[in-house]
């Protein structure tokens, strides 16, 4: 039995879905524990792409059960559409392999509308996906939320909707002056979706607990990345949930279950979608080259990702925040055959040199300390035994600065293009 957590170690989009899909081959459960359909995971199998937003990456493996934990904010419209889209591709999804926590907080039309009008009416853009994630978490924390199980009870759903709409109605009508669905319109839509999706509702807490007790392999699949964590991230340019390993405990399982591996997924360079500080961002042709070669366009938003050199002070910070045991390095092939290759090993900040970021640091004011690395060249024939010396040096530089080993290396989009230096499912 192995308990494995997959955490994004940057600002999201690191390739978590690819690693989760690969590990799912040996997993009994793959669990989503936070976020919502603002996540976007791309899986490539036999040259065919599959895009996932809510459903865990284990869905492509028939023996693997997929769990959406109670820490996820659930858009029932998005879930229904994703199930329908995947089933149309011949991917089996049923109440036998998909389990959705009855306690997931529901995203309504009101949340999505509020998300959109706030972003368009503020001078400080956060770069929200507009999926209603933040407003749904607000309702959850303020105890105005609607749970998945509430969709199955007409009286309860109507009363919870009335509570949720009470304040928002004033905002829509008097402040933002926008049209919004009536309570009855929203009720009719959500109740109908509830009847359709009820088959997937489950006590996921007990499902996970029993799987661990039975010695099953469980993989927890994070969304976004540590640097977007509402507490640890680059606030206010963050998401609304705990994207660090702490999110597993609050969103899926109990603190009584330890983890055998906490794998930090990171690209061989750095990307960011939306607003916020980015110390190593490249504004020149090199940045454009990485963006083009890496296909850096958001799966969820369609926005072009900002690109820059690998930032080791931030990676070390992420490792500390989530107690990472190792790094899974992705998209190494994007850096192949570059004329110039650099990595950030530290910052100059307030008259000092620092080598690990921390919560109070102002990343707008740091000056990255960049070192030149020898460029390397790899192709699909790369193995652990024929790896170029320059690439080995690049990997060793990362390990030495962050203080944990690199346990796998991805050098292409498909699940076959990964070198594993460690068996995550092997004890000891």
Swiss-Prot record:
GO terms for biological process: 'de novo' AMP biosynthetic process; IMP metabolic process. It is found in: Cytoplasm. The lineage of its organism: Bacteria, Pseudomonadati, Pseudomonadota, Gammaproteobacteria, Thiotrichales. It catalyses: IMP + L-aspartate + GTP = N(6)-(1,2-dicarboxyethyl)-AMP + GDP + phosphate + 2 H(+). One of its GO terms (molecular function) is GTP binding. Binds 1 Mg(2+) ion per subunit. This is Adenylosuccinate synthetase. It comes from the Bacteria. Plays an important role in the de novo pathway of purine nucleotide biosynthesis. Catalyzes the first committed step in the biosynthesis of AMP from IMP. SMART domains: Adenylsucc_synt. One of its GO terms (cellular component) is cytoplasm. Pathway: Purine metabolism; AMP biosynthesis via de novo pathway; AMP from IMP: step 1/2. Homodimer. IMP binds at residues 13-16, 38-41, 129, 143, 224, 239, 303. GTP binds at residues 12-18, 40-42, 305, 331-333, 410-412. Keywords: Cytoplasm, GTP-binding, Ligase, Magnesium, Metal-binding, Nucleotide-binding, Purine biosynthesis. The active site is at residues 13, 41. Pfam families: Adenylsucc_synt (PF00709). Its EC number is 6.3.4.4. Mg(2+) binds at residues 13, 40. Its cofactor is Mg(2+). Substrate binds at residues 299-305.
């Amino acid at each position: 039995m192995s308990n494995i957590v997959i955490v994004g170690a940057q600002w999201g989009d690191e390739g978590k879905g690819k690693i989760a899909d690969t590990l799912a081959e040996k997993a009994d459960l793959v669990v989503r524990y936070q976020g919502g359909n603002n996540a976007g995971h791309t899986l490539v199998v036999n040259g065919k792409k599959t895009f996932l937003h809510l459903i865990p990456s284990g869905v492509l493996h028939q023996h693997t059960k997929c769990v959406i934990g109670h820490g996820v904010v659930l858009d029932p419209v998005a879930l229904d559409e994703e199930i329908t889209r995947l089933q149309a591709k011949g991917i089996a999804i049923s109440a036998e392999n998909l389990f959705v926590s009855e306690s997931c907080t529901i995203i309504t039309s009101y949340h999505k509308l509020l998300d959109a009008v706030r972003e368009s009416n503020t001078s400080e853009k956060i770069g929200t996906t507009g999926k209603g994630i933040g407003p749904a978490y607000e309702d959850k924390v303020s105890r105005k939320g609607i749970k998945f199980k509430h969709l199955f009870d007409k009286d309860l759903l109507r009363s919870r909707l009335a509570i949720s709409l009470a304040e928002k109605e004033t905002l829509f009508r008097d402040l933002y002056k926008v049209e919004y669905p009536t309570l009855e319109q929203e009720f009719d839509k959500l109740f109908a979706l509830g009847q359709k999706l009820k088959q997937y509702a489950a006590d996921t807490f007990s499902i996970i607990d029993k799987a661990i007790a039975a010695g099953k392999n469980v993989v927890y699949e994070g969304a976004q990345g540590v640097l977007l964590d509402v507490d640890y991230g680059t606030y206010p340019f963050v998401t609304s949930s705990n994207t660090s390993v702490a999110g597993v405990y609050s969103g899926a399982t109990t603190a009584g279950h330890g983890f055998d591996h906490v794998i930090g997924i990171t690209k061989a360079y750095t990307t960011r979608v939306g607003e916020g500080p980015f110390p190593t961002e490249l504004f020149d042709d090199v940045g454009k080259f990485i963006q083009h070669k890496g296909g850096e366009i958001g799966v969820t938003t369609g926005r072009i990702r900002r690109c820059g050199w690998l930032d080791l002070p931030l990676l070390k910070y992420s490792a500390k925040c989530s107690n990472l045991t190792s790094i899974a390095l992705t998209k190494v092939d994007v850096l192949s055959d570059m004329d110039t290759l650099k990595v950030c090993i530290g910052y100059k900040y307030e008259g000092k040199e620092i080598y690990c970021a921390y919560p109070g640091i102002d990343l707008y004011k740091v000056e990255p300390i960049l070192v030149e690395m020898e460029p390397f060249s790899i192709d699909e024939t790369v193995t652990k035994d024929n790896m170029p010396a320059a690439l080995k040096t690049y990997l060793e530089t990362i390990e030495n600065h962050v203080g944990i080993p690199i346990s796998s290396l991805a050098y292409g989009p498909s699940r076959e293009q990964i070198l594993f230096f460690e068996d995550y499912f092997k004890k000891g």
